[in-house]
Amino acid sequence: MTNNQKQQVDRSIIVGETSEVYLHRTLNILRNEGLNPFVTYEIESTDSGIVCGINQIIDLLDHVLPEADREVWALQEGSEISENEVIIRIKARFASFGLYETSMLGTLTSCSSWATAAHKCVTAASGIPVVSFASRAVHPSVAGQVDYSAYVGGCSAVSSLIGGKMTQTTPSGTMPHSLVLIMGETVRAALAFDRHMEKNVPRVVLIDTFKDEAEEAIQVGRAMKDTIRGIRIETPIERGGITPNLVDEISKKLEGCLLYTSPSPRDGLLS
């Protein structure tokens, strides 16, 4: 998946605040020596995966390279890459872009790593939609970037508002533990969610806060039989974590209560 929406280049990148000091020193030396050669500059991959960050680098180069006397070639955003493959090739005067090596490499490294990780999850899911909640695992200044990268990697949706804006998609989410804890009871929280959320928001209920997961799943299933879309399991490691056996147990108990009729846990109430 790709998104060609232009992203504004941060001023701190343009003025070189995010660049390493030795690049500033290099440009200073070359300037004093009267050297500004026309060069061919290539960025290669160090591993296989999904390339991401191309569009941001193109936006940066459009901003800093002269209109004439330049040539830029790059792979398409979201392309599968192999080890040592050329990702970007720039032909221009070194002084026009040499300062931005740090930003270009950092963008490609982080975004491609996130996109590749997302792609691995999507591949393992075998057709089941995967939603990125990665924004809670990074600094807020890059929350949009990690969600965008996950979307490029194949995720069907992202969780943050800025990620939704950058991918031009509707942010996706379920229920946090805080809502269930404040409401004091899982079914009560689920019914409040059902009452107050727009109809187009999937009713996916968190079921591991107070009681046994299967018990809570049955309770919310009965209370919201006509509207529930799925359940979310987030059992902490201290209680055994999320395991195939736990998923199978919940599935069988839901089937026994006629709340779950799909032939596979992947297709029905489980999330």
Residue ranges and their predicted role:
Residues 79-81, 88-256:
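Buried, small/hydrophobic-residue-enriched core segments of structured protein domains
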Residues 17-21, 208, 234-235, 267:
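Acidic side chains
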Residues 260-271:
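Single conserved hydrophobic/aromatic residue that forms the stacking wall/gate
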Residues 1-95, 103, 108-111:
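Flexible, solvent-exposed loop/hinge segments and secondary-structure transition points
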